[in-house]
Regions:
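Exposed aromatic-hydrophobic patches
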Residues: 107-110, 574-582
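Active-site mouth of glycoside hydrolases
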Residues: 78, 142-403, 417
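Bacterial Sec-dependent signal peptides at the C-terminal "C-region" and cleavage site
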Residues: 26-47
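Extended acidic/polar, glycine-enriched regions
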Residues: 88, 92-155, 179
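N-terminal Sec-pathway targeting helices
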Residues: 9-26
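Aromatic- and carboxylate-lined catalytic core of secreted/periplasmic carbohydrate-active enzymes
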Residues: 42-46, 52, 72, 420-421, ...
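Non-catalytic, glycine-rich low-complexity segments
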Residues: 41-87, 94-97, 137-140, 522-526
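Active-site clefts of carbohydrate-active enzymes
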Residues: 346, 389-391, 408-446
């Protein structure tokens, strides 16, 4: 009799189904039990980048971690170290940071502040395991500039730690510098600004925007302001792809797939789907490259933690927010060329208590105590009397900056705590909002240049911004200016600022004080009476100066072109002296120094 296919019995089918379900249940049980448990790696290898380095460079210890890796290396593993002078007189507690998505690489950096021998001990922790390493290195005096500090003798001003040179703060904004895909564009932007004697750039770490403020810029592959310090959540990414698939198949289901597809989109400021517990390593590595390039040119980078333009932030005071700040400190703190800025337009997304607490924490967490500030819209929210707050970062757009900065100096003196005064947002070239006070022409290169003179002649410092009209991802696509730092040869505003920098740094400006009462006709004067008189004449002409008797060298400077004209020795016997007329029209500066 021919054999046909056997028919499975119902009981056999039930047994097989039961076995499959049992295996599936066991797998789920194992996953549930062990999910989140951090097992130790099989081995950890430590390596040291340098045995000998200059003071204010940094040594880096790389930690290679084998599998099994921490489930989330940003929360489930850590690298910490103690660095000490060989004689044990000084110690620094330093945090390391994860530098790979899978947790296979950690790094810890240390910037030694002086020549000598140093030792260290580091510990990597993952789960219940601890792996340690120790070593030493030698530091030479390479005459490098260290971090900028407040001049202890002249507290309105800054000095470079290490060399003791004075730092003439001359800044610009380039908020989304690291939004460039091509690192060569970033390096070229820094180099160009450095050649224009810009020595400070405001760059955001986490700020994002979908507003372009009327400028001819747009997000595209080559540049975007939709920067991504964090990774997006895996589950949200899967939902997003599922939603996109439904859209492509033209499925509706009451708009469900449209809703799902929008559940995660890093380009969406309102719903980026960030997992605040995981950092996007490629973005932070790109930022490292920008900082290293700036470091080689003594360019200070003001690290603006976040911006009001971002529509989502980690919750104020949350573990996510503090993890972000501590990661930034661990990663970037060893660069000598940084300062901290708690946030742009800060008072619109954080209150004063947060500002005070967070500024204080940053000074506790940062082993190098880099200078720190904040940048609110309303200047009453600056924490000017607190120890953590090192200099002002005003936002004031009027075209009466000289009087404003003098008033701020007076207010600061009234607090019993002298710190440098800086206006870091008084306007951008070719960009002047309707709400700002100034009138037609207030956004021209010449108006901003003159405004910068008003600020520095009040003993203050300033940060300006170049035109963005040359376009980013919009033809001619050669600019970006204040938004991203890129520029071309048609952008010449900062050439005018160069002459101001040259004039101010030609004398010991930090030894002078505003003394407008010594000059007439609306002119401005910085003086150390009897030694230095630096005068700015907004409308050229002559100036009458109340001056102590003596012989002085005198030089006219064309504030617009940098042209210099030396006068014969000025011999003063009476308490007033009237200059000859300036050699030209427009604005001029006059410098008298005692022989």
């Amino acid at each position: 009799m021919p054999q046909g296919n056997k028919i499975a019995s119902p009981s056999g089918t039930r047994r097989r189904v039961f076995r499959v379900l049992l295996i599936f249940a066991l797998i789920l049980t194992v996953v549930f039990i062990f999910h989140g448990i951090t097992f130790p790696p099989s081995h950890v290898d430590f390596s040291q980048s340098k045995q000998v380095l200059d003071a204010y460079d940094f040594v880096e210890l790389e930690t290679r971690v084998s599998s099994p890796h921490a489930p989330n290396p940003f929360t489930d593993a850590s690298l910490k170290g103690v660095f000490s002078t060989a004689d044990g007189s000084k110690h620094w507690q330093v945090d390391g940071f994860c530098d790979s998505d899978d947790g296979s690489v950690f790094r810890i950096r240390f910037m030694p502040p002086a020549a000598g021998d140093y030792t260290y001990s580091v510990e990597y922790q993952q789960g219940w395991s601890h792996r340690t390493s120790s070593g030493s290195f030698h530091v030479t005096d390479g005459h490098r500039r260290g971090p900028i500090r407040i001049d202890a003798q002249n507290r309105w001003h800054f000095v470079w730690e290490g060399t003791g040179e004075h730092y003439f703060f001359n800044g610009t904004t380039a908020y989304w510098l690291v939004g460039w895909r091509d690192d060569n564009v970033i390096r070229a932007a820094i180099e160009r600004l450095h050649n224009l004697k810009i020595n400070r750039m405001r760059v955001t770490i986490a700020g994002r925007t979908d507003k372009f403020f009327g400028e001819p810029v747009m997000a595209a592959e080559s540049w975007t302001p939709h920067i991504r310090p964090w990774r997006t959540g895996k589950s949200l990414r899967l939902l997003h792809y599922f939603g996109r698939l439904g859209q492509k198949l033209h499925l509706s289901w009451g708009g469900l797939f449209d809703f799902i597809s929008n559940s995660e989109n890093p380009e969406d400021l309102y719903h980026p789907g960030f997992d605040y517990s995981r950092f996007d390593i490629s973005y932070w590595q790109k930022f490292d490259g920008a900082l290293a390039c700036a470091h080689d040119r003594d360019m200070i980078i003001s690290l603006v933690l976040d911006m009001n333009d971002s529509r989502t932030h980690p919750a104020a005071g949350s573990e996510d927010e503090r993890r972000f700040i501590r990661y930034a400190i661990a990663r970037f703190g060893a660069y000598s060329n940084i300062t901290w800025d708690l946030g742009d337009d800060l008072d619109h997304y954080r209150d004063d208590a947060w500002t005070h607490d967070t500024g204080t924490l940053i000074k506790q967490w940062d082993p190098y105590k880099h200078l720190a500030t904040s940048h609110p819209i309303d200047n009453i929210h600056q924490d000017r009397a607190s120890d953590w707050f090192d200099f002002t970062s005003f936002q004031e757009w009027s075209r009466n900056q000289h009087a404003f900065m003098l008033a701020q100096r007076k207010q600061q003196e009234g607090l019993g705590r002298i710190i440098p005064q800086a206006n870091e947002e008084y306007g951008y070239e070719d960009h002047y909002p309707a709400w700002a006070i100034g009138g037609a022409g207030s956004d021209s290169a010449d108006a901003l240049r003159r405004t910068a003179w008003e600020i520095v002649m009040a003993g203050g410092y300033q940060t300006s911004g170049e035109t963005a009209r040359r376009g980013t991802n919009i033809l001619p696509d050669t600019g970006g200016g204040w938004m991203n730092g890129r520029g071309d040869n048609t952008m010449t505003m900062f050439q005018g600022y160069v002459h101001m920098v040259d004039f101010m740094t030609s004398f010991d400006w930090w030894k002078t004080e505003p003394h407008d009462e010594l000059v007439n006709q609306g002119n401005y004067c910085l003086a150390k009476p009897g030694e230095i008189y630096a005068i700015y004449l907004p409308h050229a002409g002559k100036v009458t100066l109340q001056i102590l008797p003596g012989s002085y060298n005198a030089t006219w400077w064309n504030a617009n072109t940098g042209q210099k004209s030396t006068l014969s020795t000025v011999n003063v016997a009476s308490p007033t002296w009237t200059s000859p007329g300036a050699p030209g029209v427009n604005d001029w500066a006059l410098l008298l120094r005692k022989k």
